[in-house]
């Protein structure tokens, strides 16, 4: 995955991808690739055990998200951009590929609810907090989120046992397979757009990264140890997606709302680079504590 990051960096630095081009790729990920990842994860045979595990993963995922939001508020309540950036991980762009790499594509089933909830909260509460305008906290805004829609569609497919024909599953799987390389290429472009010297010499960014990459994952592991042994794989999935770096959407929202997008990009980039060290450590710790 690190190689894809380098490719994105080089493509931008050599002018083969522009800033507008990277925005288009990010939209492709959000509106097409990630929804296909979610829908594909629900194209499996229904079972009562699977239904219970899905409910557990959504409930536990909601708890983990609330934990992250509470921790970020505690540390950064006077800095809305830092608070929202730290609260919401890059669960879609980095979490999904990591879950697939570590546990297999089937495990994305357990991450889908978390990622959809995260995006819904980021889309509504996140933008409201950043802008100071509560107009973003509306049901209509939630229902326009592509990941929420794909989760709802996936739940209907799964519980109603709707067969998805092969001619749809094949292209859906192919598009879903683009997630890891495309997401990391986009992150590489973000990195290339940033002044690396400014990133590494700004102490505030290290504080943000420490909370996002160390404090929150450690608390997540402690809380998920309460899950029964039979549900530890669900715990592993949630640890992976909640140990991911600061979500890149914070940069998109900052730019859209006319805020300091360079600050947002810097926090995304430094936390992404540092996560190459912290993620293996957190996964190793989780494995040592009995997670799958």
Walk through the language-model features, giving the residues of each.
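Alpha-helical transmembrane segments of multi-pass small-molecule/ion transporters
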Residues: 1-292
């Amino acid at each position: 995955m690190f190689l894809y990051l380098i490719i994105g960096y080089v493509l931008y630095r050599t002018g083969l991808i522009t800033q507008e081009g990277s925005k288009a790729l990010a939209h492709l990920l959000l509106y097409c690739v990630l929804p296909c990842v979610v829908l594909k994860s629900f194209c499996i045979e229904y079972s009562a055990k699977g239904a219970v595990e899905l409910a557990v993963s959504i409930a536990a995922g909601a708890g983990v998200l609330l934990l992250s939001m509470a921790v970020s508020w505690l540390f950064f309540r006077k800095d809305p951009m830092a608070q929202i950036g730290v609260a919401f991980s890059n669960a879609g762009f980095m979490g999904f590929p990591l879950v697939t790499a570590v546990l297999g594509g089937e495990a994305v089933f357990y991450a889908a609810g978390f990622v959809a909830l995260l995006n819904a909260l980021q889309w509504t509460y996140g933008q409201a907090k950043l802008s100071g305008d509560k107009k973003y906290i509306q049901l209509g805004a939630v229902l326009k989120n592509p990941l929420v829609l794909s989760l709802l569609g996936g739940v209907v497919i799964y519980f109603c046992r709707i067969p998805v024909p092969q001619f749809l599953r094949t292209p859906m799987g192919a598009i879903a397979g683009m997630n890891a390389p495309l997401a990391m290429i986009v992150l590489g472009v973000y990195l290339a757009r940033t002044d690396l010297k400014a990133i590494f010499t700004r102490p505030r960014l290290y504080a943000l990264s420490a909370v996002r990459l160390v404090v929150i994952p450690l608390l997540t592991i402690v809380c998920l140890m309460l899950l029964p042994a039979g549900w530890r794989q669900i715990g592993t999935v949630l640890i992976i997606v909640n140990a991911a770096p600061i979500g890149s959407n914070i940069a998109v929202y900052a730019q859209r709302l006319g805020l300091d997008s360079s600050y947002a990009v810097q926090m995304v980039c430094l936390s992404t680079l540092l996560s190459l060290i912290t993620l293996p450590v957190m996964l190793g710790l989780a494995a040592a504590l009995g997670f799958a």
